[in-house]
Design a protein with these regions (language model features):
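Coiled-coil termination/hinge junctions
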Residues: 1-21
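Conserved, carboxylate-rich catalytic/transport cores that coordinate ions
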Residues: 19-367
Length: 367
């Protein structure tokens, strides 16, 4: 609302900013009033993240904004697990190095802003993760170094590694499922934290605590710990007794049985993390196959020309497909398995008042 001499404005601001904004308004002769959101109003969601986690908010927002008043900020957890999972699935150190360099150069030269800056920053971080995991797996353009050394000297030079996914698939699967269980347990813990903060302590015990007993007990039983069987049985009994507590009559029994049937959902979620192993294997295998195809013609001039051509085309294709697959499946693990445990959506992002420009960048003048 505006007249010839006055302007009336209203909007939302974070509670932590009221003192600073109030001081600025007072210094400029403005009358103002702060108030909490009234019933029926629709305030936006403001997530205050540290710079390290801020970029990964762009991943969360692909799924949706948390509801206003949410007690759990998912961005720090998304940042940690997105960093880990993307690197495992892209899995080639040379690919990660290329991605890191491209992202770093773009950030330094183009100086993007807004969402573009956040996405490129995510690319920088996951590129670093890929270098780390690729080094663990000993994959640099697949087996390029052993292949080149064999073509040039007739002897293969092997790169030191900590885990060979091709030679040790079971260890790779255990690593993938283990990280998956940690991911799910964190999501369950966040759900319990939300319930407790909202005053539902016993719901957290019954709906989350008993499932911790079941899952941890089953893991213990699988590795030969006898007590794990009793833990799982105690958790199952707890779920059976309390699962139908909000229902009446026969529903208390059927509700408990229905809740206990949720074990199939948890097992399905855990098995879903086998995609970490599958994509990690596929990236290295395809890169290695390209190197093998390129080396079939031998060491002559034609052989080297063929090798360079197949290497360039094949590795570029594998890089593009690998980065797409790693992004899609990492997002899938966040959105379905992780967010499904605790995320409350339906919010809208807080958008601060600022100049929106397309082709120019406004810089703050230093006094």
């Amino acid at each position: 609302v505006q007249t010839q001499k006055t302007t009336y404005m209203e909007g939302w601001l974070p509670e932590a900013a009221t003192e600073k904004i109030g001081k600025l308004l007072a210094e400029n002769g403005c009358a103002y009033e702060f108030s909490d959101p009234a019933e029926g109003e629709d305030p936006p969601t403001y997530l205050e993240n540290k710079p390290l986690f801020h970029a990964f908010g762009s991943i969360t927002e692909l799924y949706g904004m948390p509801a206003y008043g949410t007690v759990v900020d998912p961005n720090p957890f998304v940042a940690v697990f997105f960093f880990l999972f993307f690197g495992i699935m892209f899995s080639d150190a040379a690919y990660g190095l290329i991605l890191t360099v491209i992202a770093a150069i773009y950030l330094a030269k183009a100086k993007p802003t807004g969402d573009a800056k956040r996405y490129i920053t995510v690319a920088l971080f996951v590129g670093i993760s890929t270098v780390l995991w690729g080094s663990v797996f000993g994959s640099w353009f697949g087996d390029l170094i052993p292949t080149l050394s064999r073509m040039i000297t007739g002897k293969e030079v092997q790169i030191p590694l900590l885990l060979d996914p091709l030679a040790q698939p079971m260890q790779m699967l255990i690593l993938s499922l283990g990280l998956g269980m940690v991911h799910l347990f964190v999501g369950m813990g966040l759900a319990a934290y939300r319930m407790i903060k909202q005053g539902h302590f016993w719901d957290a015990v019954f709906d989350i605590g008993f499932w911790y007993l079941i899952l941890l007990g089953l893991v213990g039983a699988l590795v030969g710990i006898q007590a794990g069987i009793y833990m799982a049985a105690a958790g199952a009994l707890g779920v059976l007794i309390t699962g139908g507590r909000h229902k009446k009559g026969l529903g208390k029994i059927t509700g408990g049985l229905g809740s206990l049937y949720g074990i199939t959902s948890y097992l399905s979620d855990i098995l879903s993390y086998s995609r970490l192993m599958a994509l990690g294997l596929s990236t290295g295998v395809v890169a290695t196959v390209m190197n093998t195809l390129g080396s079939l013609a031998g060491n002559g001039v034609i052989g080297w020309v063929l090798f360079i051509f197949v290497f360039a085309v094949g590795q570029t294709f594998n890089f593009a497909i690998g980065i797409l697959g790693a992004f899609v499946h990492t997002c899938r693990l966040q959105f379905v398995e992780f967010f499904g445990k605790f995320f409350e959506g339906g919010g809208r992002a807080f958008a601060p008042l600022h100049h929106k420009t397309k082709y120019v960048q406004l810089l703050k003048e230093e006094n």
